């Protein structure tokens, strides 16, 4: 778990940064208490604010060294209507790793997240969950998430990703 102030202070990303980017991308305004005790207001509810220095993004990621956030204005996105998770097994690590740039640079598909697990991580996860996810020799696994509003488009995208993984 986390708090939004910490996310902004660290400019956190997380697993879905592949598609959605880091926290700073969505910060449109801040109220900050400076180390001197002064309260400053940066940005706000305006869509276009291009005059002067970009102090919002100077503060975002400053880890609290430039001030403490007391108000944060965030641009929110609607939740995607549909989500698909693909679990792809590979014989070895190098094959799994080679697929990731193919997917990312393909251009027509932006995965929400791409998570890599080597054989040891897969085995430990299976033990912990008391599950058996695969048969045969698996050297690595990718968990690829895609999301969107059009189910047919998602089906098309995961079929393309599946072909890239072969």
Short names for language-model regions:
Residues 1-166:
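Noncatalytic alpha-helical scaffold of FAD-dependent oxidoreductases
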